[in-house]
């Protein structure tokens, strides 16, 4: 995969500017791209003056979070944590652009490499030395009690159906492939992709799914019932959550920042997304190694198969 070789190649740089060291990393990335003849456009919140006044970043085009931000862009480069990546993915998904994450945060499960390898990552981008991995998404539709569509959205990680005020119990019925599974009270129901299985669904007791697996994960969150185990269903399945007519108003929250109101008696339908995310990969390190590294899992004493050559990734923390 390469960035299209036209004269006005351009990368949308999406930095988390909350820390001085992050701004310095963004400036470095912008300079490296510019020196390689790649145009730079910087995404910044409207209230953020850090970029505009920065001696390096202030020289580049600045845009806000809108569909226009990705016009004439070839790739989205994210510098930050998982939250920054998910917001950048919102733009990349709408424009069908590849997205690359460099972790400047703590865990950074969605990032490809760590900040210490930023210069090499940018070099790979400018040379086209990367491949694209298609990551599954979810399409979300909300219908009122009369069956009228009242909202649609999508998620890369998960959609969480939960009480709007988070102070009561969500009374709901879970449905798989147009058949009822169970009715119960809970804090919420999480429907996740394999990519999102290490996020909110994992914290709620769900299993980790390897990202190359095609499946949909359903995790009841703090449910008050006997049968509330996580479910792994076919990627072709439809998952629905019906709110009880006398229930409190609820909300379908997608990736933690996009939301749709779910009134009493409403229905939330979740299916495999019609468009995947184009995930930039810079190496072939197994997901198992990423999992161990990110979660700092203890593996002392492991010897491994005979004659196995260990894989070492110098670009991951």
Curated annotation (Swiss-Prot):
EC number: 2.7.1.23
Sorted UniProt keywords: ATP-binding, Cytoplasm, Kinase, NAD, NADP, Nucleotide-binding, Transferase
GO MF annotations in UniProt: ATP binding; metal ion binding; NAD binding; NAD+ kinase activity
GO BP: any one term: NAD metabolic process
Superkingdom to which the source organism belongs: Bacteria
GO annotations of cellular component type: cytoplasm
Active site positions: 82
Xref: Gene3D superfamilies: Probable inorganic polyphosphate/atp-NAD kinase, domain 1 (3.40.50.10330), Probable inorganic polyphosphate/atp-NAD kinase, domain 2 (2.60.200.30)
Positions with a binding annotation for NAD(+): 82-83, 87, 157-158, 187, 198-203
Reaction catalyzed: NAD(+) + ATP = ADP + NADP(+) + H(+)
The keyword Glycoprotein appears for this protein: no
Cofactor dependence: a divalent metal cation
Compartments reported by the entry: Cytoplasm
Major localization listed first in the record, in broad terms: cytoplasm
Protein task: Involved in the regulation of the intracellular balance of NAD and NADP, and is a key enzyme in the biosynthesis of NADP. Catalyzes specifically the phosphorylation on 2'-hydroxyl of the adenosine moiety of NAD to yield NADP.
Similarity-based family: Belongs to the NAD kinase family.
Protein name: NAD kinase
Gene source species: Corynebacterium diphtheriae (strain ATCC 700971 / NCTC 13129 / Biotype gravis)
């Amino acid at each position: 995969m390469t960035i299209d070789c036209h004269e006005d190649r351009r990368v949308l740089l999406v930095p988390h500017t909350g820390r001085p060291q992050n701004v310095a990393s963004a400036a470095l990335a912008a300079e490296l791209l510019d020196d390689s003849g790649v145009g730079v456009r910087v995404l910044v919140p409207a209230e953020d003056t850090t970029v505009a006044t920065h001696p390096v970043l202030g020289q580049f085009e600045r845009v806000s979070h809108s569909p226009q931000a990705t016009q004439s862009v070839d790739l989205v480069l994210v510098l930050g944590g998982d939250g920054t990546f998910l917001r950048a993915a919102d733009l990349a998904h709408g424009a069908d652009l590849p997205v690359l994450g460099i972790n400047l945060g703590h865990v950074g499960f969605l990032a490809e490499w760590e900040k210490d390898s930023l210069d090499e990552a940018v070099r790979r981008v400018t040379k086209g030395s990367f491949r694209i991995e298609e990551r599954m998404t979810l399409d979300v539709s909300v219908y009122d009690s009369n069956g009228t569509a009242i909202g649609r959205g999508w998620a890369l990680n998960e959609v969480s159906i939960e009480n709007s005020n988070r102070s009561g119990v969500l009374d709901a019925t879970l449905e798989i492939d147009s058949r009822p599974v169970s009715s119960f009270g809970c804090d919420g129901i999480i429907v996740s992709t394999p990519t999102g299985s290490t996020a909110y669904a994992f914290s709620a007791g769900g299993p980790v799914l390897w990202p190359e697996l095609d499946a949909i994960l359903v995790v009841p969150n703090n449910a008050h019932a006997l049968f509330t185990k996580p479910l792994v269903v076919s990627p072709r399945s439809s998952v629905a959550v019906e709110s009880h007519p006398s229930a409190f108003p609820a909300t379908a929250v997608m990736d933690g920042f996009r939301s749709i109101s779910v009134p009493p008696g409403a229905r939330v339908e979740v299916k495999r997304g019609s468009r995947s995310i184009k995930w930039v990969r810079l190496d072939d390190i197994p997901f198992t190694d990423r999992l161990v590294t990110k979660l700092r899992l203890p593996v002392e004493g492991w010897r491994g198969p005979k004659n196995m050559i260990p894989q070492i990734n110098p670009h991951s923390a």
